[in-house]
Amino acid sequence: MAGVNKVIIVGNLGNDPEIRTMPNGEAVANISVATSESWIDKNTNERREVTEWHRIVFYRRQAEVAGEYLRKGSKVYVEGRLKTRKWQDQNGQDRYTTEIQGDVLQMLDSRNERQQTGGYAPQTAAPQYNAPTGSYGAQPSRPATKPAPQNEPPMDMGFEEDNIPF
């Protein structure tokens, strides 16, 4: 059985996208997205929060879109996969970094919010940008599955939602 390498991130940009052009002329965008988890500490009854930062890279048209429309604070939905790169530093030491290679980018802010942060979006709905099929080893998309019935009662999982640490 093949493995699964899929990441879904919903969060806010920590800074403006960094855009550069590769020698072949294709655009590359690097963004840093924050996700936060909060919960109530059982012992102190205080709200706790942990923020995680994610490095995400987009290529080609998605990189151009990120550079044009995204700004610090923009709320985004990203689908992608983890990739680890290796390079040598100035001292010849091997270095590694793991980042998310973005395949899907969707802006979640309203048009007014994007305009206030300096971005511009002529669309009326939040646009979604998918990486071209077959690029960078992407698998072809599969047909959508039938959604689960919405009239079923929620399952009792044996715990209270307020006590979940995420």
Swiss-Prot record:
One Gene Ontology term of the molecular function aspect: single-stranded DNA binding
UniProt KW keywords: DNA-binding
Entries under SUPFAM superfamilies matching the protein: Nucleic acid-binding proteins
Coiled-coil segments on the chain, per record: none
Region (Disordered), start-end ranges: 114-166
UniProt GO BP: DNA replication
Domain SSB, chain residue ranges per copy: 4-109
Record-linked InterPro entries: NA-bd_OB-fold, Primosome_PriB/ssb, ssDNA-bd
Segments of skewed composition (Polar residues): 125-138
PROSITE patterns: SSB (PS50935)
GO cellular component, one term: nucleoid
CDD domains noted in UniProt: SSB_OBF
One of the Pfam families matching this protein, by short name: SSB
Subunit-level organization: Homotetramer.
Name of protein: Single-stranded DNA-binding protein
UniProt organism field: Pasteurella multocida (strain Pm70)
Lineage of source species: Bacteria, Pseudomonadati, Pseudomonadota, Gammaproteobacteria, Pasteurellales
